[in-house]
Amino acid sequence: MVCLLCGFFSTGISMASSLILLSASDLAGQWTLQQDEAPAICHLELRDSEVAEASGYDLGGDTACLTRWLPSEPRAWRPTPAGIALLERGGLTLMLLGRQGEGDYRVQKGDGGQLVLRRATP
């Protein structure tokens, strides 16, 4: 019984340590967002300059493109332990993309499709 509990706690600790909060400067740069492998791609720039009213960082690029999936155009973004949140002007989260790997963030849509945010390659 004691060994089972030790294994459980050990697993919980390793899972928690995999949630690393990256800084805005780590994530700043050019990114693309697209649904599945569709040809339409939104080109975004995650900037590390703060947007105080949104409690996040400046989001640049073609943010209007995101309104095909979001109820309003995002103004900012913020890193989270689980991934990247896209924010409206007042700071509410419009979308949370979960980290899948280095430079790869995803969210499952209600219709079964998937939105993929990837760091753009130079």
Q: Which ranges hold each PLM region?
A:
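Short, low-complexity, Pro/Ser/Thr/Gly-rich segments in the mature regions of secreted, periplasmic
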Residues: 112-121
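N-terminal helix-cap/turn-to-beta initiation motif at the start of protein domains
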Residues: 16-30, 69-72
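N-terminal glycine/threonine-rich, aromatic-flanked beta-hairpin/loop signature
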Residues: 33-78, 93-96, 104-113
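Surface-exposed, flexible coil segments in extracellular/virion-facing regions
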Residues: 83-90
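Residue-level signal for tight coil/turn positions that link beta-strands
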Residues: 81-82, 101-102
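Bacterial N-terminal signal peptides
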Residues: 1-12
